[in-house]
């Protein structure tokens, strides 16, 4: 079901063209009225984030051209509208397509503020290294900030507690299908042993900023850490196996049933 919201989003213009007949027309001077209507509609499908823009052009109660964002271009409804549709597709098509966001989505978020758009979605933050290399080699840290709403967000990089401003770059905000956003903020750096890099994220959904750390360490240190984790996992497995065997051995073999039960 499509929800039509003309009160705030419908910008309809009705132009009444009054054409006076020539003085020589029988019956004297009389007025002839021609009505040209321009009707844009924004549709929002209930329970989804789908938006549709439809613009109708009507002359004397007859629609002759239509733009539908689902189609993506102006289409002539009658032969009268064919020249206009061809011209508008050449001159104004990109601007009209953009109005799905600049008009419909923008006004819906700013004026209607429906329950689905009042929500605050907290971002997820993950740090990754673009290339696996040893210390003291140029590299790039990537802070992936995903699934947040609204779009306003501030992401900063810190090295050992000091904000980094050189070598920082960012993608544009990427809109997800559910209206949440994601962004990648990169930091070009040369990691040295003991350095701590922090991705600092501020967002309206957060009571306090999210901070995620990445520590520079050598391959040998990383290998030792992984070996330690693997040793702990194996230790837990063998401990559980030993307890299981001990529990089974304490039960002992079952003896024969009492003699009275065999009679």
UniProtKB/Swiss-Prot annotation:
Disulfide bonds: 42-104, 143-199
GO biological process: adaptive immune response; antigen processing and presentation; antigen processing and presentation of exogenous peptide antigen via MHC class II; antigen processing and presentation of peptide antigen; immune response
Transmembrane feature ranges: 225-245
Residues making up the signal peptide according to the UniProt record: 1-27
Domain Ig-like C1-type span(s) in chain numbering: 123-211
PANTHER family: HLA CLASS II HISTOCOMPATIBILITY ANTIGEN, DQ BETA 1 CHAIN, MHC CLASS II-RELATED
Record protein name field: H-2 class II histocompatibility antigen, A-K beta chain
Species in which this protein is naturally found: Mus musculus
